[in-house]
């Protein structure tokens, strides 16, 4: 399967790129050999399917009819942010100014290595065919979005038989907007699609896909007392190992931590990364759990205000579900950021909030939260509402896998009967108050999410932000 993808990419490259440098052709053997580490990169690396699929078919249960489909997706693979890029460049500066021969796992730097960030303008941006470091790279955000669109049509294309004109909603980050546009391109020209760019600025208040941006009450340091307990001596060990192999290098534990991000973003930009081979399997596990902890206690159920933040969008999706019989549109497609999806899944109860993650050790048996499983680059969450005979059901499909609601999954395909789902959802949002908890009034007077209902008259076209 993967070879066919590589060959198709190669064919496209030959048509569109003219002469491919021989060095890049030599690298094709490395592409696709590192996919086993994607789940350990904290959602910074390329897309992969949810590993815990429980063996449940994602096909519509036999004899059922889809009534409404909602999608909430993350932007595709990207270059690092400005801040993360600056950190990676500092480590690269140390390495590039080392005057001796590299040894051990850094020896690849002796072979005319080219740093993957070739242009500062690429920071914050989607990786594309045009800005990728390797014309054979199958992991660009552009290709991911287009491939997702074709897979979407294969799975749900029948939903468009009587609906060829519809909106797609995107947060106003440039990379989110670009992902939505590549997805539109992948759907093909048989559709008349209106791309609605919805503000993610603080002033947008509740009328946004990115409620966290309008939440001045949110404090990323709120649970540092927990996070600081996590043992990060493995980073010291990495730095010591590399320094021992390369006398006078003087890498720090911060450099070691940065190398994990370097690995992930280079995969997005190049299709492979020799930096990824620096780490042992144990080190990847420890890094991955550290990323899980940070997300759980900053953007997930470990932070008590997140359920209220996610309720802003979750309540809107509930309203759409309840209006499915009266709404002309049957498919609702939205693109945003990973934190927004984590907030949403926290409110929905898909991420376990009964047991907080421990920072004392890596809980192999008890950990059900893996950040990268939920929000790899290009993540997608589908809410399916379907009817079987006279009964209606709801279920979630996350990154190609059906993920049942544990306490409500007795319906066909492990779905939740609609009235039971509404009861469940009511309990999930009980006590939440996005406007109050976030102190939204201090930054905006917008108190309601309306873009799903007024897009046709408002025509959202907000200024794109490079963030």
UniProtKB/Swiss-Prot annotation:
Signal peptide: 1-17
Catalytic reactions of this protein: a phosphate monoester + H2O = an alcohol + phosphate
InterPro entries hit by this protein: Acid_Pase_AS, His_Pase_clade-2, His_PPase_superfam, Histidine_acid_Pase_euk
Catalytic center residues: 75 (nucleophile), 338 (proton donor)
UniProt entry tagged with the keyword S-adenosyl-L-methionine: no
GO molecular function, one term: acid phosphatase activity
Cellular component, GO annotation: cell wall-bounded periplasmic space; endoplasmic reticulum; fungal-type cell wall
Record PROSITE patterns: HIS_ACID_PHOSPHAT_1, HIS_ACID_PHOSPHAT_2
Residues bearing carbohydrate: 97, 103, 162, 192, 250, 315, 356, 390, 439, 445, 456, 461
GO terms under biological process: phosphate-containing compound metabolic process; thiamine-containing compound metabolic process
Protein EC: 3.1.3.2
SUPFAM superfamilies: Phosphoglycerate mutase-like
Further remarks about this protein from its record: Present with 952 molecules/cell in log phase SD medium.
PANTHER family listed in its UniProt record: ACID PHOSPHATASE PHO11-RELATED, MULTIPLE INOSITOL POLYPHOSPHATE PHOSPHATASE-RELATED
Family as reported in the entry's similarity comment: Belongs to the histidine acid phosphatase family.
Protein name per its UniProtKB record: Constitutive acid phosphatase
Organism: Saccharomyces cerevisiae (strain ATCC 204508 / S288c)
Gene transcribed to yield this protein: PHO3
């Amino acid at each position: 399967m993967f070879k066919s993808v590589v060959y198709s990419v190669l064919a496209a490259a030959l048509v569109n790129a003219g002469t491919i440098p021989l060095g890049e052709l030599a690298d094709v053997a490395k592409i696709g050999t590192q996919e086993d580490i994607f789940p350990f990169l904290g959602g910074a690396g390329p897309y992969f399917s949810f590993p815990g699929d429980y063996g449940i078919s994602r096909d519509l249960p036999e004899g059922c009819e889809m009534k409404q489909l909602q999608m909430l997706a993350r932007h595709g693979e990207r270059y690092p942010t400005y801040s993360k890029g600056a950190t990676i460049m500092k480590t690269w500066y140390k390495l590039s100014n080392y005057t001796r021969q590299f040894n051990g796992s850094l020896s690849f730097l002796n072979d005319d290595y080219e740093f993957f960030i070739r242009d500062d303008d690429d920071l914050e941006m989607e990786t594309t065919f045009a800005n990728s470091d390797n014309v054979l790279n199958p992991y660009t955000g552009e290709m991911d979005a287009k491939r997702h669109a074709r897979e979407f049509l294969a799975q749900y294309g029948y939903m468009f038989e009587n609906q060829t004109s519809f909106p797609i909603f995107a947060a106003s980050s440039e990379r989110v907007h670009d992902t939505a546009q590549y997805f539109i391109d992948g759907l093909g020209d048989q559709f008349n699609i209106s791309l609605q760019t919805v503000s993610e600025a603080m002033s947008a208040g509740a009328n946004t896909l990115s409620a966290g941006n309008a939440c001045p009450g949110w404090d990323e340091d709120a649970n540092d007392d927990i996070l600081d307990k996590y043992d990060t001596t493995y980073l010291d060990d990495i730095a010591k190992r590399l320094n021992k192999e390369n006398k006078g290098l003087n890498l720090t534990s911060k450099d070691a931590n940065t190398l994990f991000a370097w690995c992930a973003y280079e995969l997005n930009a190049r299709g492979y990364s020799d930096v990824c081979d620096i780490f042992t399997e144990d080190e990847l596990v420890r890094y991955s759990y550290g990323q899980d902890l940070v997300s759980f206690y900053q953007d997930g159920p470990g932070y008590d205000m997140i359920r209220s933040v996610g309720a802003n969008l979750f309540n809107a999706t509930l309203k759409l579900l309840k209006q499915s019989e009266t709404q002309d549109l049957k498919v609702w497609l939205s693109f945003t950021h990973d934190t927004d999806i984590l907030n949403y899944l926290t409110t929905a109860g898909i991420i376990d909030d009964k047991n907080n993650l421990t920072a004392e050790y890596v809980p192999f048996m008890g950990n059900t939260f893996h950040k990268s499983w939920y929000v790899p680059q290009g993540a997608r969450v589908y809410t399916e509402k379907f009817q079987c005979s006279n009964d209606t059901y709801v279920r979630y499909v996350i990154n190609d896998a059906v993920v049942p609601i544990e306490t409500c999954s007795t319906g066909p395909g492990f779905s939740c009967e609609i009235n039971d789902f509404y009861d469940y959802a009511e309990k999930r949002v009980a006590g939440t108050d996005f406007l109050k908890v976030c102190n939204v009034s201090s930054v905006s007077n917008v108190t309601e999410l309306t873009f799903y209902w007024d897009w046709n008259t408002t025509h959202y076209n907000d200024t794109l932000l490079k963030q």
